[in-house]
């Protein structure tokens, strides 16, 4: 991980409903698709959603989105839904800073554990998640349903 001055100039910041204007400039590949204003407003307005941005010179260069899952029979947990850093700034410590920030926010909101999944062939993501010191769980099957 080659941290450099560009990465040091990046601000890591949790965002909420009042921060929608920050999404006016988003670097390539930070999100999987275009940010839609109505979906962004709904996401940021949900009390169990957490989003942390990496900002450089007013541009979103990274993000992590997470959801708090509340259970009637188990401790609350944080699901890391999406992590993205623009390719020009990857492998410079920004992803780790985003994950550290979202973990801290999850802890502060009562979560006792966090979990994340990624594709087996996504080696950069797997390397990052491994460096964060998880307990690797056994493989599971995921199912997707169109509603």
Report residues per predicted region.
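Terminal substrate-recognition subdomain of acyl/acetyltransferases
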Residues: 2-3, 141-147
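Acetyl-CoA-dependent GNAT
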Residues: 3-6, 10, 14-75, 81, ...
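Active-site acidic-Proline motif in GNAT/NAT acetyltransferases
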Residues: 86-88, 92, 120-121
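Conserved acetyl-CoA pyrophosphate-binding loop and the N-cap/start of the following alpha-helix
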Residues: 89, 93-101
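Conserved active-site alpha-helix within GNAT-family acetyltransferase domains
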Residues: 96, 120-139
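Conserved GNAT acetyl-CoA-binding A-motif
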Residues: 106-117
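Conserved beta-strand-loop-alpha-helix junction that forms the acyl-donor binding cleft
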Residues: 115-125, 144-147
